[in-house]
């Protein structure tokens, strides 16, 4: 019997855009869905970009619940973008007490990704049982 639970990813999309302060951006967004049968918190994701041969070109960790508008992506530097996306508690959606079967949005941003990027992978790199769970 497979162990129940986990975090699944849904509605994952990618797009390229240009920021005046940070250059070209690869923006990956979607929903992290709590499949555990208890509330969770501090959902942390790892995004990896790969070339056509599967060689890793870069990786970034962010926390769910942090989203940037197109205006922010355009205005912020790469360091400011990363700082915004690494807020543990989530700035736009609370990354705490995420009920079973509920979801929380996420965003991963690679600044100036290599031209050889062919695919991306999203992995769960951390999650905690919510203090609010019984």
Predicted features and spans:
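Asparagine-centered strand-capping/turn motif at beta-strand->loop junctions
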Residues: 32-36
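Short structured motifs
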Residues: 11-16, 29, 89-94, 106-107
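The feature marks short-to-medium sequence segments in extracytoplasmic or secretory-pathway proteins
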Residues: 41-89
């Amino acid at each position: 019997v497979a162990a129940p639970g986990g975090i699944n990813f849904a509605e994952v999309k990618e797009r390229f855009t240009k920021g005046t302060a940070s250059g070209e951006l690869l923006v990956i967004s979607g929903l992290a869905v709590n499949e555990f049968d208890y509330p969770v918190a501090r959902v942390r994701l790892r995004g990896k970009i790969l070339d056509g041969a599967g060689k890793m070109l870069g990786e970034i960790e962010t926390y769910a619940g942090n989203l940037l508008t197109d205006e922010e992506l355009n205005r912020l530097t790469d360091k400011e973008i990363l700082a915004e996306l690494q807020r543990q508690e989530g700035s736009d959606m609370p990354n705490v007490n995420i009920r079973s079967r509920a979801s929380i949005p996420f965003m991963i941003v690679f600044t100036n990704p290599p031209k050889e990027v062919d695919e991306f992978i999203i992995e769960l790199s951390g999650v905690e049982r919510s203090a609010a769970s019984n």
